[in-house]
Amino acid sequence: LCSLAPLQKRLAMLVEIPFDSQGAPGKPRFAPIVMQSWGRLIYEDVQHFFDNPGQKILARGKNPLRDADQIGKMLGDAHELYKILARVRKERGTLDFDLPEPQYSFAEDGSITGVRNAERNDAHKLIEEFMIAANEAVARHLSTSKIPFLYRVHPAPEETRLAALFATLQATAVENLPAGIIKNGQPAENAL
């Protein structure tokens, strides 16, 4: 019931967030909606569109996009916003676990025939960035509205464990590692 298929109606929750030109979020709007996609786009097609400005976006399958120009403009705007949000998030010192994930190939009988690293391009990262923005908007709304909700709290790390971590890091050949906790500094330092 949650998968998107062209022209199929699906229940969803809308999180609409206005952003300024610097990537700062405005007041979000939340609403239950019925969503109907116009066509099937896959990550590779969207990435091809990003890599080839001026070309029309094409959908796969039997349901062509109703308005490829409108979708192309929306995707172009979304790509620009993604780049701003990614820059802002990096400046905040968040980690980007850009680790390879396996992608399996299957035979008709369901047996695995191969495995390779899955590609992670801007089309993938755009969706991830927008999901993070939606999650943050919901968390801010629940917190400022004093609505009780469950969330995960990460306690401060134990000093002895941090000392062991920094000793291990210093034993590596990696350059420019912090020697201890840094309150202000580069984004990667803030992550520690």
Locations of regions flagged by a protein language model:
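Electropositive polyanion-binding surfaces
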Residues: L1-L192
